[in-house]
Amino acid sequence: NLDEGDELSWVEITDGNRNLIVATHDGMSICFKESDARLIGRTARGVRAIQLAEGDYVVGFAVALEDTCLLTVSETGYGRKSNFDDYRVQSRAGKGLINYHTETYGKVAMIAPVREDQDIIMISQEGIVIRTPVDQISAFKRPAKGVRVMRTTDEDKVVTLSVVEHMEPAVSYTHLRAHETRGNLV
């Protein structure tokens, strides 16, 4: 049973013994033990993960796995990887910790657990799509800004991202440009 205005956005299968991180648009996050979220029937509401400030909402959650780190991407196109150890385990339903300084660097668009051998695909409000290897994004402790992972304008913003397996491009950009210009690189 969901309250009016609520929605189910993410589902993940786990072993029941992990830490979970939930992050919000206003830059807060909470890390809690999965075992703190008690088992309930399928018609129940569930349990509160994080206490939200007025107007704030959840932008993502991640299961802390050994070979992954947490990627945070802002609407202004900045991103950073952080170790899950940077997030102190708390009791669920609290206010959490500052994950990202949104007043300075923009609101959080999404978070995702990532591995170094993966890529992320980001999409902006204006429909611009960019693919970036995770290993090219620097790691910083929270609440650092990170590095530019997607250029946005004042009128545009990052709205979503997906994590995909890394794939080498079929044709290099240099080869493509040389072919288009009959060998004359521009």
Identify the meaning behind each predicted range.
Residues 1-173:
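Intrinsically disordered, low-complexity regulatory segments
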Residues 174-181:
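Conserved small/polar residues in nucleotide/adenosyl-binding loops
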